[in-house]
Amino acid sequence: MSRYDIIQSHMVFGGIPYYLSYFRKGYSFEQNTDMMLFGSKPRLKEEFNRLFRAIFTNAEDCKKIIRCLAKRNYGFTREEIASATGLPLGGGLSDTLTALAESDFIMRYSPYGKRTGEYYKLIDNFCLFWLKYVEQNQEDATFVNDNFTSDVMKGWRGVAFEQVCWQHIQQIKHALEIGGVKSSISAWNIKGDETKAGAQVDMLIIRDDNIVNLCEMKFSGSPYSIDSEEEGKMLHRLDMLKDTLSSKQRVHMTLITTYGLIHGKHSGKVQKVVTGDDLFM
């Protein structure tokens, strides 16, 4: 497989060798995914349920949490999870969240700009894809082949690529030449009001050398081009973030995209570019 197809396989299957072993030579990524997950008798027809039964004694509670977290990319607080799932807010929920985190289904993080409270975020690509598309469309034997580049799957492609980036933090830091700089990783979401639109940043690398990498992650089948509308959105997020920083801190606008950036009149604010190849370092 090409590196582009390997990234796509991570977006759907999380790069798990067990799943990738079913890929058949001579077939495209889309065709292989259809054969494994869609149609009347796909190889992984009951994989979502089988996976949780095999790992957890309280599989149903775990699936409730995963279904909840799949609804919002930046995640939920423990209290929000309890409310959405009906699970008691107590030690049992804490133990289940810990077990899911230790098994790499979810991650726990502290959102930038919030002094208290932790969020839980779904990071398992297979679960995200299953809940988004497989459950509702499994009988459609050519679903991925017919829809992968269409608007039907556009939103998911962006979110899934972001998940892959979160799973390759060390490679991203290495590409930025900051592997030895102490840093924390966070997401940031700020609500707007009547005078100003809100902003959502899917990855911040907050460094001890007083630089913050504001990371924009874009999945693309070709070198990425920034138009005037996208530039405006990026500048808005940049300005909103700067308002929260100290006078000592600087922001480096960082683009992470599969095939790099086409430099043009709207790309001037981008200071660092990380490519798909960098994720293999």
Regions picked out by a protein language model, each given a short descriptive name:
Residues 29-80, 152:
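Winged-helix-like regulatory helical subdomains adjacent to P-loop NTPase cores
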Residues 4-7, 17, 31, 63, ...:
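Non-catalytic, well-ordered alpha-helical scaffold segments
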Residues 86-103:
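Short amphipathic alpha-helical interaction segments
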Residues 101-112:
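A short, conserved structural fragment
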Residues 111-112, 118-281:
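A cross-kingdom feature that marks ATP-driven nucleic-acid transaction machinery
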Residues 1-51:
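Amphipathic alpha-helical "lid/sensor" segments that cap RecA-like P-loop NTPase cores
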Residues 10, 80-83:
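The alpha-helix within a helix-turn-helix
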